[in-house]
């Protein structure tokens, strides 16, 4: 080990040089260890498949069928296969570039063609190892951009890594997202909160333009879409989970109706335990709930959004600094209307508040009185934490996390990319709510993808 130490204290520059050298040696040692372990695994798998050690004779009279087959005749009898040397290849890993891996080869003795070997460690044409796939999913879930991921990979591997390379690995998760939209929900929540959050997704139009290399490209334009989200609550377990979402063109009742029908078909029905739906007053959600659920569930309007509308109305009626204290008093008393033990008491509180403010702020009073009973529907619920069902604030927190990803991405290049991003963010939130490591969750997702796409 050629490190120059001195009897005296090292300067900062000397110490930096020592640490850099040590890091390089550690990396080289790690790469050699990875290479050795992988080679041992490959040889061990070949020995297990063939059922014999190197140099041991074949048992030609016995059939030993395995999942590897000859690329020519299709034979799967391991006793017809023999070792046929190695081919050399490289592999990109999270530790760096592993060179000169000697991968075992097999030959079929019936037709003397190569046997197609599907090793557990990696596939034949796989450039990047599994740990980099895991890193892509983990990092995207933490809202890191494609450029940030490729920059880190490029530094580790000592070369350039394309944005598409990383993006394709992340977008593989979209398959899991589509599966989650179709699975039957067996454990039905007591309450669901519904809301929409806007996102920009790019799409192609009919206009064709030429790029710098004079290649014809369809012009891409961002389109504002809305993600309809359903957050479920289970009172007995005091847990929450995003049970579904849908990318839609708007919050019109047709889009909400399609989304609610899917939830209904997946088992989210009053017969299975659904008691209430919590929502704000915007869009066509109310009409969609009437169509899909009718009066079989409690339709609770968000109190926070109702009071926000009152605040907006009061700011127009009681303008200026001279009415600042009045506005503050009005809102404090409006919030106190909901400090009640029953629906009847809440209505009495509303009447008292309305009588006090009707002359000074008639529009504010009309705003709170409008559909007031829909904001106190939660009193009909039994055995449910009322703090969960008075507002959509918990779902707003979910949307805040989704917006964090949307702001980082600015816009998504396709619906596939948007679905993959939503799925990863929702899985990360579920991991957080259940005190599970996102690192382990993302690793398992990567294993599942590798299993689904062998």
Regions found by a protein language model. Give the residues of each.
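RNase H-like nuclease fold core
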Residues: 55, 65, 77-86, 107, ...
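Short, amphipathic alpha-helical "recognition" segments used to contact nucleic acids or chromatin
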Residues: 129-143
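Short, charged amphipathic recognition helices of the HTH superfamily
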Residues: 142-153, 345, 350
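Conserved beta-strand -> loop -> alpha-helix junction used to position metal-binding or nucleic-acid-contacting
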Residues: 276-283, 288-333
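Short acidic (Asp/Glu) and glycine-rich catalytic loops that position anionic groups and cofactors
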Residues: 21, 114-115, 238-240, 303, ...
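Acidic/histidine-rich catalytic cores and adjacent linkers
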Residues: 2-17, 336-454
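Short, conserved DNA-binding cores of transcription-related domains
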Residues: 1-119
């Amino acid at each position: 080990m050629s490190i120059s130490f001195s009897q005296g204290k090292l300067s900062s520059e000397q110490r930096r040089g020592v640490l850099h050298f040590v890091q390089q040696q550690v990396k080289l040692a790690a790469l050699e260890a990875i290479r050795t372990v992988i080679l041992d695994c490959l040889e061990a798998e070949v020995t297990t498949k063939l059922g014999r050690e190197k140099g041991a004779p074949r048992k030609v009279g016995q059939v030993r069928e395995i999942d590897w087959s000859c690329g020519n005749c299709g034979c799967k009898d391991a006793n017809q296969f023999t070792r046929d040397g190695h081919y050399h290849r490289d592999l990109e890993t999270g530790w760096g570039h592993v060179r000169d891996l000697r991968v075992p080869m097999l030959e079929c003795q019936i037709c003397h063609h190569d046997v197609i070997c599907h090793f557990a460690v990696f596939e034949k044409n796989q450039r990047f190892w599994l740990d980099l796939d895991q890193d892509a999913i983990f990092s995207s879930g933490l809202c890191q951009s494609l450029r940030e991921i490729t920059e880190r990979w490029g530094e580790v591997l000592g070369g350039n890594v394309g944005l598409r390379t990383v993006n394709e690995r992340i977008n593989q998760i979209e398959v899991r997202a589509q599966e989650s939209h179709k699975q039957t929900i067996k454990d039905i929540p007591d309450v669901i909160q519904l809301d929409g959050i806007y996102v920009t997704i790019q799409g192609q139009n009919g206009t064709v333009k030429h790029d710098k290399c004079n290649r014809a490209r369809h012009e891409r334009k961002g389109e504002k879409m809305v993600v309809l989200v359903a957050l479920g609550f289970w009172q007995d377990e005091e847990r929450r989970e995003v049970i579904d979402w849908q990318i839609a063109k708007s919050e019109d009742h047709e889009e909400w109706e399609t989304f609610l029908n899917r939830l209904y078909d997946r088992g989210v029905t009053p017969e299975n335990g659904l008691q209430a739906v919590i929502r704000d007053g915007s869009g066509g959600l109310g009409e969609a709930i009437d169509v899909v659920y009718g009066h079989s569930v409690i339709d609770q309007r968000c109190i926070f959004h109702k009071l926000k509308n009152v605040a907006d109305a009061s700011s127009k009626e009681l303008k200026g600094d001279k009415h600042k204290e009045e506005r503050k008093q009005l809102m404090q008393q409006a919030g106190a209307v909901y400090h009640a033990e029953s629906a009847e008491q809440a209505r009495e509180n509303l009447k008292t508040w309305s009588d006090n403010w009707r002359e000074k702020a008639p529009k504010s009073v009309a705003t709170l009185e409008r559909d007031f009973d829909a904001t106190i529907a939660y009193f009909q619920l039994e055995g449910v934490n009322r703090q969960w069902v008075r507002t959509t604030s918990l779902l707003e927190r979910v949307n805040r996390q989704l917006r964090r990803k949307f702001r980082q991405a600015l816009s998504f290049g396709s619906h596939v990319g948007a679905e993959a991003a939503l799925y990863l963010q929702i899985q990360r939130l579920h991991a957080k709510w259940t005190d599970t490591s996102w690192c382990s969750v993302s690793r398992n997702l990567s294993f599942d993808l590798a299993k689904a796409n062998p």
